[in-house]
Every structure is written in C-alpha cells, then in structure tokens.
Design a protein with these regions (language model features):
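Domain-core and long-helix interface of multi-subunit machines
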Residues: 1-35, 39-54, 87-168, 202-207, ...
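Divalent metal-coordination and catalytic microenvironments
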Residues: 4, 37, 58, 78, ...
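Short alpha-helix plus adjacent loop in nuclease-associated cores
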Residues: 11, 64-77, 156-177, 346-348, ...
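Noncatalytic, beta-rich nucleic-acid-contacting surfaces in large DNA/RNA-processing enzymes
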Residues: 32-35, 51-53, 190-191, 241-1019
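Glycine-rich, histidine-containing beta strand-loop boundary motifs that form or position
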Residues: 36-39, 60-64, 76, 152-156, ...
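Short gly/pro/ser/thr-enriched loop/turn and capping motifs at secondary-structure boundaries
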Residues: 41-42, 65-68, 82, 157-161, ...
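Metal-dependent DNA phosphodiester-chemistry modules and their immediately adjacent helices/loops
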Residues: 66-68, 75-98, 174-194, 340, ...
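Active-site or pore-adjacent capping/gating segments
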Residues: 165-246
Length: 1019
C-alpha cells in the first residue's frame, strides 16, 4: 500500500533515514513498500538491502518534481524499468530543462499522477494516485469510468510533529528564507506521516476497488537485484583468453626489459601473480589501467602509481608503478590472494593540470554510457547546522557568531537557541548535498544508467548517485585517478632547468635520484623544504631522528609518520630501536621472524596481516577483513568484532599470554584507516627522492616550480625565503619581466603578478597580453596609454615595485601617475606617427627599505626587501642561533624566531603546540609548547617572538621546550608616521600557518605496557 515513501535522501525535504523507514515497515508487518525519493535514486541500494533483511518486498522508483511541483511518480516494474528511470533522470539533470506535466513513454515503469493534476486520458501503465482526504471528490461523474485506474497514494515524509518541524527547517534552508515566510507550496502536508496498511485499508474501506488496484500494482512489480556480482568492464579485448594472452605478453616483455631474461626470482613471482590474476578474472582491470598509462606516456605526462597494486610485479613490468617488489620484498598476499573478491587498488597520480586530460581520454575511450565518477554525499555538520538553522529563525550575523563560538550552556535561557540546538542535533549527519568522489572512476560493462541516475556538476563529468561503499556492494571496483601538486613541482622544475640552464634532466629515470649520495645527506639533515611528503616539520624531525640516509629507511619513515603507527604508540619505539638495534628484545619470536626489517614493529598494513595470521593464527579471510579496515573500506563493525573475537580465541589456543595478545590487538586496531601498505610508502619515497634531487642540484628552478604549482605544506612566503637562502635574487612583481606566475631569469626571481593582493586577474592578463603584442613598457606614460587602468590599481603596482625596471623612484612614479591619469584623454583611433613620450622632471624622492618592506607586507603579505627581523624595534637577535642548538642540550636559551607554522596536538592534559621558526640567519628550528606554558604564554598571531626555553636534543634532532615567549613589536609604519590610526594596521598582515588536529591523544609509553625487554607475561 505504501507507494510513495521519502527518505532523507530527498535532500532538504525528507526526514527519515532509510534504515528507520524499513524498520518501521518491519515493526508494522508491511509486506511491500516503495522508496520514491524526489528526483534521485541515491538511497535505493541501502533500501533494498534493508528490505531483504527485514523480509519486505522492495519497490523502487522516484517522485518527479519540477520547481517543487509534483508531476508524477515513477515505479519500476523490473530491472529494465529501473534503467529507464535512471536514463530519464540523467537526461533531466544533463539538460536542466522544465518538465512536461505528462510523462514520456516508459515500457517497464508505472506512472502515477497526483489526483489534483491527472491527465484526462491515461495510457496502459498510467494511474492516478489519490489521498484519503480527496476521496469525497470521487462522487463526480468524471471519475466513475476511471475507478480501475486509481490507486492509494499516501506519502510518507516524516514521522511526527517534531519531524515535520524539521522538514520545514530543511525547506527554509533549501529556499534560503525565513521559516515564517514558507508557504504551503514549499512544504509537505503535515499528514504525510507513516501509516500502516491496516490504517490505509480503513481509510479506503468504501473503495475496495482502489485497494485492489493498489495491491495488483504492487504484486506486478518484480524488481530484484543481486549484490556482489562484478559490474566492471569485463574485458579489455574481446574475451578473457585474449586478455590473458595480452597481459602475459606485456608483462614478460616488461620483465625482460627490467630484469633481463634469466632473472629466476622475477620469473617465479611474475608467473605466480599472472596465475592468480587469471583465476580471479582481473586481467581486464590490469589492461585497462595499462591502457590509461599508455595514453599518459604518449602525451609525455609523468605519473605515480601507488596503492596495494604497487606490490605487484605485474604492475611494475607494465609500467603502471615504479616500485620493484623484489627489491623491497613486498608481501604478495597484501596485493592479491584467493580470498580477495575485488582487484587491488591502483591509485594513479598525475599533475594537477594534466588529470582532466586523462579523464577526457577515459570517457572518450570507454564511452560516456559506461564511465562515471563515483558519487559521495556531504552531510550536515553540527557547527554549520547551527548557523543554517539560526538563519531561518532570523538570527543576525553577530548572534550566529556568538552561537557558534560559545557552548549551549551560555544560552540556556533563550528558547529560540534551545530550539536551534534541538533541531541541530536531529539534523547532524543528514545528507545535505550529492557530490562527487575525489578520484574514483567507474567503468562498467553494461550502461551505467542501468544502475543509477547521473548528476552533472559544473566540470561536466557525470557522477553516479551512490558512494564508493555502495559501488563496492553492488559490484563496482573504482579506478582511482588522482592529481597532486608534487608532480607539477617536478614537471615544471625539469622544464625550467632546460629553459634556464639548457640542461635536460631525465627525472623519470628513478635510478638518477633514488639513493643519490648528496640527496641522502640532505635527507639526513632534514633539508627537505618543498619536497613531496617529506617537508613538514614532523617529517623533517623524523628524518633527523632516524638519520635517514637511504631509500629503505625513507620508505619506512613515510609510513611511520602516519597516524596508525603513532596511535599505536610505536613510532617512538621504532625510533629507539633504529638508533639502538642491539638494546631491545622482540615481543615474541613471530615478530622477529616476520618483522625483522622493522625491528619487530608493525609499520605497514602488511605487517598487521602477517601478525594476525602468524601470531594470531587467523585464516586468510580474516586477514582480508583487516586489510579492508586498514584501507578505510570496511563498514562492518560486526565483522571486525568477529575477527577480534577469533584473534583472542586462536591466541589463547596457541598459549600466548592474554596481556600480550590484548596489547598486540590494540596496536592492530590503531591502524584502521590510517596506515600505508609498503608499496604505497615506496611510491611516495620515490617521488620524494625525485623532488629532493631537483632541490639539491637545481634549487632555484625547483623552488620556483613549487611556488607556481602551489600545494606545498607552507605558505608562499616560506618558499620565497627558501629561494633566497639558495642564492636567488628575489625581486618584486614586474610589469616587464613577470608573468602571472613567478619567473626565474638566471638567478633573478621575479615574483608573479598574481601574488599582488587587490588587483583583478583580468587587469593582470591585459597587462601581459599588451606586453606580448607590443613589447615592454618604456615609461609610466607608455603604460597608461596602452593599459586601461584605474588610479587605485596603478598605485598598487607602483607601491609593490612593478615599475622598478623603468629606473624611477616610487614617489616620482606616483606623482607622474596622478598627473597623467587626471589629464588622460581618449587616444585617437588612428595615428600616423607615434606621439613623443611626455617626460616630467621631479626632485629625487627616495624611499627607505622599511617603507618598501611595509608596501610589500601590505600587498604581498610578507616583506622581500628585508627580513622581518629588520622591522623590529629591538636590535636583539637572540643569544643562541640555530647552528648552536646541538651544543646546548639541556641548557636554557633565549632565541628570537619568526613564526612559520604551528601545529595543534591534543594531549590528556589539554592542547599543546609544535612551532616552526626561522632565526635571524634564516635557518629553521622547532619548539614544543606544553599546555602549562601556553596558558600563560599563548600564540597571538604571526610575527617575531622572543623565546625562552630548554634545548632538548633527541636522536640528533634539537628542539626548544618553551618556558616563556612574547611577540615583539614592529617599528611604526614609516608611511604613516604621523597617522596614529594607520601606522600599525599593516602589521596585522603578518601571517602564520596553523594546523589543527582532531584525534584522541597518542598513548604515553607508560600506557603501552610493553617495555623494551620482553615482559614475563603470565597465562
């Protein structure tokens, strides 16, 4: 009887979670129910799964609305009908046109029109839906001949009055209006609540034919769906055998090129992998990935292949990855095993400005009917909810700010705020908008609209209406097509080296950079600012603590830095064991046997699986469940709990001490979703080496590429400082030498025009276009004649030094500009002779370095004419410099530091911070700020601080544990020397990088309960 149920996937309309809807059906013995969310199919598969578990017949369809007006409801008779709905909604979304009041032709769908707007003539599969309150209208003659076409249409949208109020709030949010301004047309009827079949039979008892019509329609729907059946494109060629033959041929050709013909281990590993790939029908998946890489190579694009697929020698021989599984002894079972139902992940990275071309190739090659992005759903988050709900209740911006900043306890007497809080809690976690997965692409065997409708976001690539978890449930395995800025850094750096020095660097030849001697020395000292994945303060500190000087240690470090290892409490233990390899005992002989390379500590996902199988005695199927959990793919808490129970049972049966087993499983759990497989770390390490090689031998070109491609850990100012420390002559943006991006000419680094704040991109493009067409600008007069510009923008260009190439002082240029712009007349359409440039003679009006620095601070956000320290009132530069720290272990020192970044870290005693600074010599150092110190001496924004603290040297890495600190004042802005209102405003432009961490505090050594020497556990 329930042919029109909305879930909360009727975005900003429905209020009932899918599981709750089905649960209500089960509680009231509903035999069949239809999910018909508004203009989408997002909740269908969750609904089907829930109905199958509840013993309810699932019926699927959609409610078609146009500008919130109900047109009709579509119900799928079968799988073909569901595909028809998918294609219809897709066409609707793609064209974004208005709907006709009547439905188009459907072969395998029922159409139900609302009673109030039903057409006079109905086709065979068209019906009229009537609500109980409309039954009195059936007495007219018009309806007698249509009685066999009328069915019950009771809408379920909310559960009770409170739910209805939530629905109204959602409608107000969607319409961006006040609750008080909503009309009946905007909202559902208050009576659209859950009703049982018995209630509906009573309401329609005078019209048994309508009841019978409804039952017949329900009974005739036979939509069924089988989960976990592979839906990906099956074959790259015409069939499995030719796929297998081609894959084998390509793999062996690649193997010979890499290893030679007589490499026995490579042959054995390759044969083993190919056998399993064939048995699991994954050849097509490998070949499609290979095909994408072939296109990429043909375009000259650089890529990085990572993920669990990088454990594969097949992937290595095909050129998908650049990680040799033999060199690193990569664990085959992490990549592929007989219990694995889905193919291994190949996460392929391209440069951020090349990925769209790769995507266009995939859509073109495999057909738009068969390719789409995986979907995702953004949900309402509490803080944003409070603001959204506050708006619809009419709160002002200041009230909303107060509401989001202060806890609810501050507003207990305000009834409106209490309502906002009440409905905010109800709304938290509700779907808000459909969006797209960051990188997941689905390539299907059958048309993808057989399974869903498609959305078309602004970029134009189609997106399915379900997320990655649902995709996997129904049989799709995504291809991860990613982009990152790090590859852009490497690519552009190689181009700049060729342009600037005439040297062609084959950076894709990893033998050039991996384990290169000078690079290893840079690693060891943490001199890695700008380098992919190894430039953060935490990573640079780890590299120094480990004295990392080779590829294999870097591979381990790339995984150790992940939260999984740190959350287990084992990062510090790894550092200790690495530095004291003869001063510890393994937890158990299995750890020595399986994890000897990592000193008996679980570092990679493979390590967790090895310990689960060999220490815990779990079967390989449980290992696969753990693999999925560590990859962030498992949603089955019951499945994980069952694995945990079996782990303890097997450990007890093996006679392992219970305390040891509990500690080991605690470490295993910490890896869930926050760890790398070894091959993934190895792929990252190779890219890190590539960028480090360029930084080591071609620092100016590399840092220029980092600035231009963005995406580094630090703000642009830090990379410009790094360039200056590497010998660059840093110059302000220049109308004659700069592009939008930063430009390197020899050792002169001209900052990009786009770095200037407050000047439109259109104007900057006009300046460059005119320069390209008619040559450099010879004077300010010449510039004004050629570029239409307002005085405000021109003054900014002058202040930043963009006309420095003209050889004139800023003050002189400012006067010239004002005179010229106030007198400027429209240029004649045609002139036979170029008018002579008008020149003015002015007295010399020099500006100080400090004035230039404040101009730069205002327009760039940082000074380049001098270091920030030179703007301080004090001449003090610190008692101790960075170069002295290693000799001052345990001593209290005074230092002066310019704040680069600070990172928040939760502890059991409150928040603490790690700070990164540069000293007056331009060198980096790190500080630790414990909660007690921060209470009295907090950070108060960017700038230079006087620091008092104790130097602690931990495994070759010094940091300063801060006791006291204070930000030091800058000099008065010399440009506003007599203007007390403005002479300190520019200082607020000084920036800092702040990162916040939202996680549980890492365990202390005392909480881990595993000393370095083996405990004498009792059974």
């Amino acid at each position: 009887m329930l042919l029109n149920c909305h879930s909360y996937f009727s975005l900003r309309y429905g209020t009932i979670p899918v599981q709750r809807l089905v649960q209500l059906g089960q509680e009231h013995n509903i035999s069949a129910m239809a999910l018909t969310d508004i203009n989408n199919l997002s909740g269908v598969y969750e609904f089907i799964t829930a109905c199958q578990k509840a013993g309810i017949k699932p019926i699927v369809g959609t409610e078609i609305r146009d500008d919130n007006q109900l047109r009709y409801i579509l119900i799928a008779k079968n799988q073909k009908g569901f595909g028809e709905i998918g294609r219809f909604l897709t066409k609707l979304n793609e064209r974004n046109t208005s709907l006709s009041t009547t439905a188009p032709e459907f072969k395998d769908c029922y159409i139900i029109y609302p009673f109030a707007s039903a057409p006079t003539h109905l086709k065979e599969d068209e019906y009229i839906g009537i609500r109980s309150e409309q039954l009195t209208l059936l007495y007219t003659e018009k309806w007698k001949s249509l009685m066999d076409k009328i069915v019950i249409l009771h809408t379920i949208n909310h559960l009770n009055e409170e739910d209805y109020n939530l629905h109204c709030i959602l409608r107000a949010i969607d319409n961006n209006t006040l609750l008080s301004k909503l009309t009946d047309r905007d909202c559902a009827a208050p009576t659209d609540i859950f009703k049982t079949e018995e209630q509906l039979v009573v309401e329609f008892r005078d019209y048994p034919i309508i009841i019978e019509n409804t039952k017949e329609l329900i009974n005739s729907c036979n939509y069924s769906f089988t989960f976990k059946v592979p839906r990906n494109k099956k074959h790259y060629t015409e069939c499995k055998q030719t796929d297998t033959d081609l894959l084998e041929q390509l793999a062996y050709t690649g193997m010979i090129n890499i290893y030679g013909k007589d490499h026995v281990k490579a042959q054995e590993r390759l044969a083993k992998e190919l056998k399993v790939i064939n048995e699991l029908n994954f050849a097509g998946y490998f070949l499609i990935t290979w095909d994408i890489i072939q296109y990429s190579n043909s375009q000259g694009y650089m890529h990085i292949g990572r993920g669990s697929g990088a454990n594969s020698i097949v992937g290595y021989c095909l050129g998908i990855t650049n990680v040799c599984p033999l060199e690193l002894d990569l664990y085959f079972e992490r990549f592929l095993n007989q219990n694995r139902k889905s193919p291994p992940d190949f996460d392929i990275d391209w440069s951020w400005n090349q990925r769209d071309d790769i995507l266009r190739y995939i859509f073109s090659k495999y057909g738009k009917e068969h390719v789409a992005f995986c979907g995702a759903v953004s949900t309402f988050k509490y803080r944003s909810i409070i603001r959204e709900i506050g708006k619809v209740y009419g709160l002002s911006k200041s009230e909303l700010d107060s509401l989001t900043r202060n806890p609810i306890e501050h507003h207990k007497t305000n009834s409106i705020v209490l309502l906002i809080h009440q409905y905010g809690q109800m709304l938290e976690g509700f779907p808000n908008q459909r969006t797209m997965h960051a990188c997941g692409i689905l390539i299907s065997e059958d048309p993808i609209t057989n399974f869903t409708a498609l959305d078309f976001p602004p970029k134009g690539f189609p997106v399915v209406q379900f997320d990655m978890h649902t995709a996997e449930d129904i049989g799709f395995d995504k291809f991860d097509i990613l982009s990152q800025r790090g590859i852009g850094h490497i690519d552009e750096a190689a181009e700049l080296i060729l342009q600037n020095q005439g040297i062609e660097v084959d950076i894709r030849n990893i033998a050039l950079s991996k384990d290169e001697e000078l690079c290893n020395q840079q690693l060891k000292t943490g001199n890695t600012i700008g380098c992919f994945y190894i430039e953060s303060p935490a990573m640079r500190g780890l590299l120094r603590r480990l004295q990392c000087d080779n590829y294999k240690i870097l591979v381990a470090a790339s995984s150790i830095i992940r939260p999984g290892v740190a959350q287990s409490g084992m990062m510090q233990e790894y550092i200790y064991r690495h530095n004291h390899p003869n001063e510890f005992e393994y937890f158990h002989p299995v750890f020595e046997e399986q994890l000897g390379e990592t000193y008996g500590i679980m570092v990679y996902q493979e390590d967790v699986i090895k310990i689960a199988l060999h220490y815990g005695g779990l079967p390989a199927t449980d290992g696969d469940i753990l693999r999925r959990a560590m990859s962030g793919k498992s949603r089955s808490l019951e499945g994980l709990q069952a694995v945990k129970n079996r782990f303890y049972e097997h450990c007890d049966a093996k006679g392992h001490p219970r305390a040891l087993s509990e500690e080991i499983y605690r470490q295993i759990e910490s890896f869930a979703g926050y760890s790398f497989c070894k091959a993934h770390s190895a792929s990252y390490a190779i890219e890190s080496y590539q960028s480090l090689y360029l930084k080591t031998y071609y620092p100016l070109e590399f840092i220029t590429a980092v600035i231009n491609n963005e995406g580094g850990f630090y703000r642009t100012e830090v990379y410009i400082h790094e360039a200056a420390m590497s010998g660059a002559n840093v110059l302000p943006p220049c109308v004659n030498s700069s592009d939008l991006q930063t430009t390197l000419i020899g050792k002169d680094l001209y900052l990009g025009l786009k770095l200037i704040e407050g000047i439109s991109l259109e104007l900057l493009k006009t300046i460059l276009k005119e320069r390209k067409a008619n040559g450099r600008y010879e004077s300010i007069f010449d510039f004004i004649q050629r570029v239409p510009i307002a005085i405000e923008s021109l003054q900014k260009l002058i202040f930043i030094g963009a006309f420095q190439s003209l050889g004139k002082q800023k003050n002189e240029l400012l006067i010239q500009a004002k005179l010229l712009l106030t007198k400027k007349e429209p240029a004649p359409a045609l002139t036979l002779l170029q008018e002579p440039i008008q020149e003015y003679t002015f007295p010399t009006l020099k500006r100080s370095v400090h004035e230039d620095a404040f101009d730069e601070l205002e327009l760039l956000g940082f000074p380049i004419s001098c270091m920030p320290f030179e703007l301080l009132k004090t001449k003090f530069r610190g008692d101790v410099m960075v170069c002295d720290l290693l000799q001052n272990h345990k001593k209290t020192v005074r230092m002066l530091g310019y704040l680069i970044a600070r990172k928040h870290v939760p502890t059991s005693k409150g928040s603490m911070y790690f700070g990164t600074w540069i000293d007056a010599n331009g060198h980096y150092f790190d500080t630790v700020h414990f909660p007690d110190s921060l209470t009295e001496y907090p950070f108060v924004g960017g700038g230079c601080y006087l620091l008092l603290g104790t130097v602690e040297v931990e495994y070759h890495f010094p940091n300063v544990q801060i006791l006291k600190m204070a930000r030091l004042p800058f000099i008065t802005d010399p440009r506003y020397h007599y203007d007390d209102d403005n002479n300190q405003t520019t200082v607020s432009k000084v920036k800092e990088d702040v990162s916040l961490t939202h996680r549980q505090p890492y365990p202390k050594a005392s909480e881990i309960n595993l000393p370095r020497h083996r405990m004498k556990f009792t059974k």
